[in-house]
Amino acid sequence: VICVTGATGFLGLELVRLLRERGEPVRALGRDEKALQELAKLGAEPVRVSMDNAEGLRDAAAGCELVYHVAGLVAHEKRDRNRLLATNAEGTRKLLELSDPRARFVHVASVATLGPGTGPGDLISESHIPPADVDRLPYSASKIAGERYALEAAQAGRDVVVANPSYIIGPGDRRGGTTWPIRAYLRGRLRFVTSGGLCLVDVRDVASGLVALAERGKAGERYILAGRDGNLSHADFFREVGEIAGRRRFQVNLPPRLALALTTVFPWPVTRGYAKIATRWWYCDPAKAMREIGFEPRPIEETLGDTVRFVLDSSR
């Protein structure tokens, strides 16, 4: 049996769907009852459990020879730090402790544990060292702590491999956790843009990359799952979104300090915590995953097209 935590989230749902298409027996862990019912229709065994429920996690992971630890919290404000650490760090530690020590454990970290880079020419690789001030970014700090538990377990002999996906987008995110910048831009609510950039990757490719990691990844190693042509500045990202949708919106290009100051006055739709991440450079190099596990991300133009069309269709 394969155990998938965070199975009711955007990536988790896609991973379970792929595993079931392959005929794999899946135990899908999550908290969203409606999404769990959807997973049951796919033939997965739904288990309603949270990452702070030790007894529930132990029972859910029992008998699983492969664990995909996808569950995680995404938030960026100082006030979220304790919640982030509880889920992304302590949740990982608990699952490693409670799951079968003989099971292969695929830990989903993030490029947030490796970056940001110093500029658009500083591509994040698996050996990239994050800057000293990364601890000021609550999400990054929590993912670094969780990844540390996973890598320490590997050093102690556990069969653990780490995935570091970049910014995940794609069709099907009904909650809007990854598509809100697109929605805000198309509605004319993102009136300014600033320096910085991100690396996009398709959720469908990350799901297939995780399966490839489980099959071919080396224990104790990281693998960046990112689009090979996914590195885009914010200005280029929104320009492409506007062209695909046929709705180009005017944006003022602001220096990072001014953009950060504006979030204090106008916190919506961009909060100060999110802006601190967005004004950095998160460009990535997925060469290792492509070379060692056969990771083949689709062209990012295809992903953007599918995503924007999904956003437009779901807004009608």
Regions found by a protein language model. Give the residues of each.
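A hydrophobic C-terminal alpha-helical subdomain
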Residues: 193-194, 254-297
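NAD(P)H-binding glycine-rich loop region in Rossmannoid oxidoreductase-like domains
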Residues: 31-90
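Mid/C-terminal beta-alpha module of Rossmann-like enzyme folds, strongest
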Residues: 209-270, 302-316
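N-terminal Rossmann NAD(P)H-binding glycine-rich loop of SDR-like oxidoreductase domains
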Residues: 2-24
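Conserved Rossmann-fold NAD(P)-dependent oxidoreductase catalytic core, especially the SDR/UDP-sugar
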Residues: 90-139
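Substrate-positioning beta->alpha
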Residues: 145, 176-177, 194-215, 220-221
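Conserved beta-loop-beta element that borders a ligand/cofactor-binding pocket
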Residues: 147-171
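Conserved catalytic-site region of short-chain dehydrogenase/reductase
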Residues: 76, 111-121, 168-175
